[in-house]
Amino acid sequence: MRVQSSRVRSRVLRWVAVLLAACSATAEAAVGPPEKEGLKLGFIKLTDMAPLAIAYEKGYFEDEGLYVTLEAQSNWKVLFDGVISGVLDGAHMLAPMPLAAATGVTTSAEVIAPLTLSYNGAAITVASAVWAEMKPNVAMADGKPVHPISAAALKPVVESYRQAGKPFNLGMTFPIGTHNYLLRYWLAAGGIHPGYYAPAKGDNSGSVDAQALLSVVPPPQ
């Protein structure tokens, strides 16, 4: 019985191998040549565009029959509009942008995201002068700050700005980008109102009732 079972299993495995090989050949034939060989890809000068730069320098695009031009863009909106209008064939862009286009939050369009270039790693940073004011409110261990640092440590600083009649400004890359969401979550969790959007009232600034003002600053700046 064991010998017979072994023979049956071997036959099944051989047939599976044959079927997989056939499927692979069929899929390869179905793909065919590139529909367009010359491509212009936009990018913002950030480290997460590195896969595109490496592929360009190492000749990986040409290995696939593609002749790619990489073109730096001044900000995310220019890049996004370039993809929508067809000026760019593709681009390194913020992960929520295709979702925003599909749902009509921005310009309504079908944007396909075939590849993820990064894991959305990010950090919240403050100016040295702001950190000096925050530091007394931050827990320390062996002379080093205990992470994660809550925005509660920033709250007294924001309050001192308010009393002095000065706005407390924070920058983020794009309204629909994860940077905006993460900053707002961090501030709110620490007791600082980040403001809210009120499109029904014609206010898309995201600063209604804000204690800290978030504004768009393109990455190159």
Give the location of each predicted region.
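Short, low-complexity disordered leader/linker segments with a strong preference
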Residues: 1-36
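Short, glycine-/small- and polar/acidic-enriched structural segments
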Residues: 30-215
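Pocket-lining segment of extracytoplasmic ligand-binding domains
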Residues: 219-221
